[in-house]
Amino acid sequence: MSIQVFCDFDGTITNNDNIMSIMEKFAPPEAEEVKNRILSQELSIQEGVSQLFRLIPTHLHDEIIQFLIETAELRNGFHEFIQFVNENNISFYVISGGMDFFVYPLLQGLIPKEQIYCNETDFSNEYITVNWPHPCDHHCQNHCGLCKSSLIRKLSDTNDFHIVIGDSITDLQAAKQADKVFARDFLITKCAENYIAYTPFETFHDIQNELKHLLEVKS
């Protein structure tokens, strides 16, 4: 049995949700209603996020990237946490509903690209189009967009110990099949509603300390 860590990006690895930051800065007011319909689960994540990005003109590409480079911050302890999982041969994957044009640059030099799973964007038309290269498998009918539970099934064995780290509704389906969940923000609410055991966290130091204990117990 091996330990597999599946970690969200927006609002988890980074302090802020980068998609929401983009919408607040660059989208028209109607983005707020779409966001609320996603959080209430009235819209599927795939449809809601597609609608959000269709509100953003593609000519803002360079401006958006520059904005995120200047404002996005990695959560406290993340660098040390990555060093810890590497030293202990723990498999680590980023499974993100975020977009390639900002996830890859913000993680460059920290996480190999082959360990990052995110959505793809097309800037060839007037407005941004989101492509979905990691859809739901036949076990999931939630129209996740990037289906985290499907990726967990694809990347690991059922005998592995699955750890999910996340912060929002987009992490709920993955949390349902995890052996251990580290949660913050809205994911705490959803875990409580669905009777999913979780450990709250604010920094990656919190998670690293818990993992140290887990390794001691399993050794």
UniProtKB/Swiss-Prot annotation:
InterPro entries: HAD-like_hydrolase_phosphatase (IPR050849), HAD-like_sf (IPR036412), HAD-SF_hydro_IB_MtnX (IPR017718), HAD_hydro_PyrdxlP_Pase-like (IPR006384), HAD_sf (IPR023214). The keyword Hydrolase applies. Pathway: Amino-acid biosynthesis; L-methionine biosynthesis via salvage pathway; L-methionine from S-methyl-5-thio-alpha-D-ribose 1-phosphate: step 4/6. Keywords: Amino-acid biosynthesis, Hydrolase, Methionine biosynthesis. One of its GO terms (molecular function) is 2-hydroxy-3-keto-5-methylthiopentenyl-1-phosphate phosphatase activity. It holds the Pfam family HAD. GO terms for biological process: L-methionine salvage from methylthioadenosine. Its EC number is 3.1.3.87. It catalyses: 2-hydroxy-5-methylsulfanyl-3-oxopent-1-enyl phosphate + H2O = 1,2-dihydroxy-5-(methylsulfanyl)pent-1-en-3-one + phosphate. This is 2-hydroxy-3-keto-5-methylthiopentenyl-1-phosphate phosphatase. It comes from Bacillus cereus (strain G9842).
